[in-house]
Design a protein with these regions (language model features):
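Non-catalytic cap/lid and distal C-terminal segments of serine-dependent acyl enzymes
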Residues: 1-188
Length: 188
């Protein structure tokens, strides 16, 4: 059946998060959407890929699928290195994959970096993006998050920082312990 969000495009441009973050543009290609989301916390646009559910005729949950160390700007992505896109295309879930923030550990940095700029990724994932996704895509409000490599550590921190926000959090090949000497070396 036709996806009412894609057909009407009525919700895609409307939502604004409490801090002023918003969807500034969208491209639609069948079941795939490419959104540009303005992050007020980082003062820049973030590309967000969305794969709509197999059956989008009713609200569906969201899986935030987070790329590894390169933030999806490299070739080490979920889509390029796994068949997760094909697998999830047959499921009734919105798959949301932000791109950007290479080697930023997807945390909120205390200071801006001369090379990487302002990094407020935890704010983006916990405060800015979810209300936009829920409103724009008409979701159920149920969400999970999964990440690999460097970002796997971050998604575990998100689940700790905001208990109950995600119905599930999965970390693959991450460095979950960052307070011992080995973990501190990874954080440098």
């Amino acid at each position: 059946s036709a996806d009412p969000i894609v057909v009407s495009q009525s919700l895609l441009a409307d939502p604004v998060s409490p801090n002023g973050s918003k969807i500034v543009s969208q491209e639609i290609n069948g079941q795939q959407l490419t959104l540009k989301v303005y992050s007020a916390a980082m003062d820049k646009d973030i590309t967000v890929y969305v794969q709509r559910p197999r059956d989008a005729s009713e609200p569906r949950p969201v899986l935030y699928l987070v790329n590894g160390a390169g933030g999806g700007v490299d070739k080490a992505t979920w889509w390029a290195n796994t068949n997760v896109g094909d697998f999830l295309a047959t499921k009734d879930v919105n798959v949301v994959m932000p791109v950007g923030g290479p080697f930023a550990y997807y945390t909120d940095w205390k200071n801006d970096d001369p090379a990487l700029g302002r990094n407020k990724w935890q704010t983006f994932f916990l405060e800015e993006l979810p209300p936009l996704v829920d409103a724009a895509l008409g979701t159920t409000g149920v969400q999970a998050i999964a990440a690999n490599s460097m970002t796997a550590t971050a998604v575990l921190q998100y689940a700790i920082a905001k208990p109950g926000f995600y119905s599930a959090a999965a970390a693959y090949s991450g460095c979950a312990q960052t307070s011992d000497p080995i973990g501190k070396e990874f954080m440098k």
